[in-house]
UniProtKB/Swiss-Prot annotation:
The modification Phosphoserine is found at residue 96. Residues 45-70 have a biased composition (Acidic residues). The keyword DNA-binding applies. Belongs to the protamine P3 family. Testis. Residues 1-104 are annotated as: Disordered. It is found in: Nucleus; Chromosome. GO terms for biological process: cell differentiation; chromosome condensation; flagellated sperm motility; spermatogenesis. Keywords: Chromosome, Developmental protein, Differentiation, DNA condensation, DNA-binding, Nucleosome core, Nucleus, Phosphoprotein, Spermatogenesis. It comes from Rattus norvegicus (Rat). Protamines substitute for histones in the chromatin of sperm during the haploid phase of spermatogenesis. They compact sperm DNA into a highly condensed, stable and inactive complex. This is Protamine-3. Its main location: nucleus.
Length: 104
């Protein structure tokens, strides 16, 4: 991924000579895009798990009024999930299949 970013930057080299401010802005934007893409990849892998758990807690707070019975059940699932309840994790955290991939 990093090499692709570098290629884009070098491709914009000559453009910098013709229009300094324009070329510079363009190359900067490309670099920022590359960096954010790189960061995004890392984020989706590392932070996804944390976000997942936070999401569950938020949901629990929301559902407290509607279905209080689900809270202890979800709490138990949360504790078991990361260790061995892969199936339960999938059922509880459907929107984020990322952590499951890390397990495999």
């Amino acid at each position: 991924m990093g090499s692709r970013c570098a290629k884009l930057s070098t491709g914009h080299g000559p453009a910098q000579n013709t229009g300094h401010s324009r070329g510079h802005e363009s190359s900067m934007k490309k670099l920022v895009a590359c960096v954010s893409q790189d960061n995004f990849s890392l984020s989706s892998e590392g932070e996804e798990e944390e976000e997942d758990e936070e999401d569950e807690e938020e949901e629990d707070d929301d559902e407290e009024d509607e279905e209080e019975e689900q809270i202890p059940v979800k709490g138990k699932l949360l504790l078991l999930e990361p260790e061995k309840q892969d199936g339960a994790e999938d059922a509880v955290a459907q929107p984020s299949p990322e952590p499951k991939q890390k397990h495999s």
